[in-house]
Structures are given as C-alpha cells and as structure tokens.
Amino acid sequence: WNMQLDTQPPKVRIKTTVPALRRGSVTAIAYSVSEDASMTGVQLGEQFFPAFLQPNGLYYCFFPFPLDTPKGKFTPELLTRDLAGNESRNRVLVNAGERNFRKDTLNISDNFLNSKEDVFKELVPDDISNLERYVRINNEVRISNEKTLLEIGKNTSPTMLWSGAFKRLPGSASKASFGDQRTYMHNGTKIDEQTHMGQDLASVAHAPIPAANDGKVVFAEPLGIFGNLVVIDHGLGLQSLYSHMSEIQTNVGATVKKGDIIGLTGTTGLAGGDHLHFGILMHGIQVQPLDWLDPKWIKNTITDRLDAAGAER
C-alpha cells in the first residue's frame, strides 16, 4: 500500500486571447486546469471572482475592472487550488485602458426633500432635518445597499443563461450615465459627492420594463436608495438591475425571457422624476451597462473569444 502525496500545483492554461477592457467594464477568460480544483477564479486585491466549469471542459471566469480601481492597481491574478491544497497563481494579462467620466451637478431642492420625507424617515428615523437625512442616506444607506448587491451577486447560475445584446427600455432617452461624478448642491452649498453607478433611462411615466435578457429573478423587493428593485441573474456572475420601479410584477425564482415585462418605471427610492435606473452587476459590482446593450461589444469582448477558446480543444 503506497500513498501518493500530491505536492504539485495544478497546471493552468489560459485559452482566450488577451482581453482589452476599460475601467468600469468587464471581460472573460477561458482556461483549462490539469486536475480537479477545489477553488479557482480571478483574485483582484481583496476581491475574488469565481470561475465555473463548463460542459466543454473549460473554466469560464468573468471579472470586472472596477470603477474605483486605479489602472496601476488593476493586476488580476488567476488563483487555482487543487484538492490536496496546492496552489498556482498566474498573472492574467490584460490591456487595461482608462475612460473619461462626466461631471454633473445635481441641485437638491427643498421641494424634493419634502416630497421624500416619508421615504427618508423610514430609512433614517433619527430626529434630524430632511437635508441631514438625505446626506446620510446618500452615504451610509448607499454603502449598506452596495453590500447587499455583493451578497445578491453570489446567487448566480454556473452556466450562461443569456444570449445576444441586452434589451434597453423601449423608446427611452438616456439621462444620467454610469460613472458620472456628481456634486450635490443645496441652496448654493455643496452637500455631497457620489458616483452614479447605472444608466438612467426615461420614457413615459409608469412605462413597462422588459427583462433585458433571459435569466432568473434573484431579488424583487424594496432596497434603500433603489426603491423597488428587481435583480435578474444571467449566470457566471452577470446580473441586471432595475430600480425606482413604481410596481414590481415578478417574483424571486421566476424564470424570465428577454422582453418579459417585470414591472413599471417609477420614482421610488431616491429618484427625482419617473425613470428606470438600469444597472449591470458583475459578481455584485456595478459596471458599465451600455456595453451590454451593444451587440458588437458583446461579440468582440466576450462571445467570440470564448467560442474560439472552446473550439481550440
């Protein structure tokens, strides 16, 4: 009886071409591992983005270049651990580019503050002014809501549920964009600064909202600054987010097809006027949604590269 002691780290081969991506965007890699892995995925600083074994025998890992990560700190590493606990680490080569974001000024009127008093009191019951409540919600509640999105992001299918370009709200005009650097003013005084993390789309009031792609509803309830919020999982960490809805017309666990109506636009949460705040999440991190509305971007950045890697076997 002889016991084989495994001390060899797993061998990993990346099969996809070197991805080009800009700050705030997403890319994907496909790779093979020489033995069964107990964990594998991309490590970026403190963040870990898991990979999923596909029917073609390759692991697919989608990961973001987060908006708040400086280009010099964007050094993704492929971390793989085998069943015996041996680890291999490989630097993932990426062509990372910068992106310029707009600066935007929002005037927060007393009318707006008064119209939202009930919402504010529910989120921050303390005995303070509506303005103080607003600033606290825009900071503390926002941070707490973003942590919830990271938790929701863990609830993802191990296979791709979506296909093709994502569908935008029909007949909608683009308002605020992803990455807008916002300065909040009240009566001529600066009260706050935040970054806008989605794409605001405005159509008519209470416009029906289509599911942007096929997937499964993983969240459908009010959440802080977002108001009535629906999150659809599309697999491999990719999710779409729909917020400020006046009405949610779906529920958790529902399977949706691209174009299925999931609710109506509205002004819930911190919204001023009736609109849809549309977001894309990658493992719970908010990324550039416009990429996913663009069939050429999806083909060049994601699907062609994954298809070529699968065909190479």
Residue ranges of each PLM-predicted region?
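Proline/serine/threonine-rich low-complexity linkers at boundaries of modular beta-sandwich domains
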Residues: 1-11
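Proline-enriched interdomain boundary motifs that mark the N-terminal boundary
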Residues: 9-15, 209
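Short beta-strand/loop motifs in extracellular/secreted proteins, especially
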Residues: 10, 36-40, 228
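Short beta-strand segments of immunoglobulin-like
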Residues: 16-22
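Outer-membrane beta-barrel proteins
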Residues: 19, 64-66, 189
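Non-catalytic extracellular/periplasmic "stalk"
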Residues: 26-33, 39-177
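Catalytic cores of peptidoglycan-degrading enzymes
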Residues: 165-312
